[in-house]
Amino acid sequence: MDMLRITNLKKHFGDKEVLTGLNLSVPEHSVFGFVGENGAGKTTTMKIILGLLKSDRGEVFVSGERVKYGQTATNRYIGYLPDVPEFYSFMTAREYLRLCGESLEMGKNDIEKRSDELLTLVGLSKENHRIRGFSRGMKQRLGIAQALLGRPKILICDEPTSALDPIGRKTS
């Protein structure tokens, strides 16, 4: 089964056509990446997949369900890490993951267990101070944990290692 299927996707901004009939299928249990120069439409495609941006034409299906602009029903299958993740700076990493878990309607015990696993995975398990004190690399690692929290079937990452130093890349 295809976890992601895109047919004849088109998008333009003003006079510039960014996507000109994109077609692709990504099977379950596979790895796929977009490679291209700035302005090639990589981030635009990701935002359309997430229902955050309206395409001019074409269809997107996630786990067999059609993605509709402005509706996030298919996002239950997706973990998303933007290029520069944003957080509530007054929270700790653990508090933030708890909030995200609640929005995903995860059980309290599952949230705590999964948060512990992921904070350990990304090397933030001992960080108890507010996110406002995190470096950009630490925020990127927290973004990775957030994207993985709900055990997504699809993980969409926009330049996921851009803020990680070599040690942070090994940790994540």
Where are these regions (language model features)?
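Hydrophobic anchor residue at the start of the ABC signature
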Residues: 144
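Conserved catalytic motifs of ABC-family nucleotide-binding domains
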Residues: 151
